Amino acid sequence: MKQFFTFILLAIVLISCRKTTQKVANAEVSDTYVEDNYTKKEVDIAMRDGVTLHTTIYSPKDTSKEYPIIMQRTPYSSQPYGAGNFKSKIAPNIHMMQDGYIVVYQDVRGRWLSEGHYENMRAYNPNKKTEQDIDESSDTYDTIEWLVNNVENNNGNVGIWGISYPGFYSTYAVVDAHPALKAASPQASIADFFFDDFHHNGAYLLSYFRATSLFGTPRPDGDKPIDTAWYTLPDLPTEDQYQFFLDEGPLKNLDRFFEYETADTPRMAKEGVTDDYFWNELKEHPNYDEMWQSKGLIQHLKDVKPTVATMVVAGEFDAEDLYGPLETYKNIEKYNADNYNTLVFGPWDHGGWARRKGQNTVGNYYFGDGISEFFQEHIETKFFDHFLKGDGDKNSGLPEAYVFDTGRKDWKTYDTWPPAGVVKKDMYLSPDQELTFEPKEVEEVKFISDIKKPVPYSEDIKTVFTPRKYMTDDQRFAARRGDVLVFETDVMQEDLTLAGDILAKLKVATTGTAADWIVKIIDVHPADEPAYEGMQDHLKMSNYHLMVRSEVLRGRFRNSFANPEPFVPNEKTDVTIKLQDVFHTIKKGHKLQVQVQSTWFPLIDLNPQTYVDNIFEAEESDFKTQTHTVFTDSSIEFSVLE
């Protein structure tokens, strides 16, 4: 089996043989802290259907008092396995590790040392009638029931947290929650694979190509547990990812990467079906059909028990999971008004708040020092301590919304999110590349979308797992291309604070029958802006085009994600794109810019620009260069804080 890449969505903790130390507050914490202060026990907990889930329990050696349980359920392994092998760090953060918690990690059903069959984002079952009717909610319930009744020195209170996929399981835990579950923190949580991670508004994220096998490779012996990685990630023969995917052509040509000739998995007999069942799902379900809808979790957050407090955490520049946490927070808030439900929205990439790195940057952009450390000590620890160790009332001392203004670079607190005082304001994509509050005469702005020369999503030439830094990348390189339309304000005479979602209301046409539409919101910095010392050598902050938010819509889904339809050639058509929330001030002396384009490669796959029923089955001959038009009565609806 090929070398396994140890990154896996921020989920596997690297274990080092070399003893190091980490500064926490005024103390030094060594990598042997966990082994010195905790006992470790591994158990296989039986679920209601008899399947056992492998669970690792770290309990404080000081048994003179009771402790709450904090748990994480993961598909990425609760390693290291074995009684004498300890993680170097446990719990959500080092403060909680030191403060005294019973910390539990569990391999979810069908993964690693747990029995059973794994389903990628297992669908919720609202009608459990027999002990064979299970889902992730019932597995969490059964696990908590066992823990509170069998783990010594627990105080009867349980919390759950997780980042990315473990965040999905944290959200799942609040559906049909166990009475002992008092606090849950879904962080960068997956909610629906059609809008996060592998798709954005129906466009397939080609940048996730190498991650597919992580979820779609069957275990060698079916449902039999295994303690080593059984999957490999596709090796690309070049460092130039852009050129590689351009040369590969249609998506159907990538099937060969999911035929695991060296793996101990049975070959599937059906022609055109690979060994990777997730790749097969992606290919066979190009639309938001019943399969994808059933796996979504947002629709099941309408009846969250008020006994569970939730703190949703999202990174403002999370390239992987931004839709998930924001929609999780908003839907719990909408349907469970009496619940304790808070949002933390900070200047991080995927899971950046869990790392302690002093200087807080995303890509080349610097936001300040100690931001993640502040979150861990004064927000996250405070939340769990209050609901698991304190009286658990709603007076936690934390605000409803703890949000970071990524323009002013400071924290703000609000009683609601979006905050009171937000008004909707349209800005128009006006002639002569202007962005104005008042509409002007309607004109047509055309550009050629050359299928052989798609717009890159980044200047970097590299092969990456899932790109992150592009979320704050300098967009000058794109602004200077002929197939990227640019609309820009004059220099701001006063601050403009954007707080909430953004709606791009485009009016477009195409000579073809299919097209993607990408909108980017950009903060253009002044010419005298000083450079941050950690920037890439070829970049300067002078005139830096900071991408504040961006989004794509696969045009076939402009009216329905379940029922796609072609464009009528040369017919003016409305295309509305929802961009995720921002909290960013375009400061005085800066400019606000909007870029519109139709390719974003290889972040997303290429649209053939001629309509086919399934792009995963498109032929080379389907791909055509087209001319696209944006009409200047198009507008961008901003949420402006006054």
Indicate where each model-derived feature is located.
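C-terminal motif of bacterial Sec signal peptides marking the signal peptidase cleavage site
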Residues: 14-16
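N-terminal cap/lid segment of alpha/beta-hydrolase-fold proteins
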Residues: 28-63, 488-494, 567
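Accessory cap/linker subdomain of secreted extracellular hydrolases
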Residues: 86-89, 98, 120-123, 130-133, ...
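Alpha/beta-hydrolase fold nucleophile elbow
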Residues: 152-164
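C-terminal, loop-rich substrate-recognition/catalytic regions characterized by aromatic stacking residues
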Residues: 232-236, 243-264, 358-642
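Conserved alpha/beta-hydrolase "acid-adjacent" motif
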Residues: 319-326
